[in-house]
């Protein structure tokens, strides 16, 4: 039996795909004990703050518990393989496509508290990754309206800023999770993003909406904490699993997203 921890946006899609593929699984909160008949664990529980990561600057206890203490407690409580859904928002800058071997450069000295917690958790979990996975996703988006969906955020924000970034389509992510459970490729860190990258303006143009644009300087003044903007290298993932290219994923998902509103 598979244990799925988490009841958030990403966990919903993983549960839906597991059901579609007839996995025997149970869905639990992050305080529940691992059942004795469990064979594999997917940890999609965490704390991202509402409406966005700025909330983590004040809710630091919740951020530490959900993103650092919880995955460590889980790893120390069982010998089962675990697939952690984490974040690729641990880098800043475009000097390269960041690989799984690169040390995070967006942490407590220059990052949001959320990103810093994710970077620290990755470091602390590293000794466990000989028998576990850590999926680093970025800017998740999907075909349904949801306050955590990147498309819904872009639709609702009064002003936007243009950056190039890696992105993760949540249905593709869910299929990838199921593939890893079934095939068990090499353990470790994986950048689970749709290959390539895209920009805010490209996505907004695909959605066919008009927005007012901020400069990078204005955006920096408007947010409570700095944001990660970067492109992750996906070659390691591509060697074991194929996800749609970023541009294709945006185009097809936006089409479905719009159709759900008609």
Show which residues each predicted segment covers.
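Conserved Rossmann-fold NAD(P)-dependent oxidoreductase catalytic core, especially the SDR/UDP-sugar
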Residues: 72-109
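C-terminal amphipathic/interface module of NAD(P)-dependent oxidoreductases
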Residues: 210-213, 225-262
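NAD(P)-dependent short-chain dehydrogenase/reductase
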Residues: 123-172
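N-terminal Rossmann NAD(P)H-binding glycine-rich loop of SDR-like oxidoreductase domains
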Residues: 1-21
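NAD(P)H-binding glycine-rich loop region in Rossmannoid oxidoreductase-like domains
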Residues: 32-66
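Mid/C-terminal beta-alpha module of Rossmann-like enzyme folds, strongest
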Residues: 176-179, 183-224, 228-229, 262
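NAD(P)-cofactor binding segment of oxidoreductase domains
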Residues: 55-83
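Active-site helix of classical SDR
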Residues: 113-117
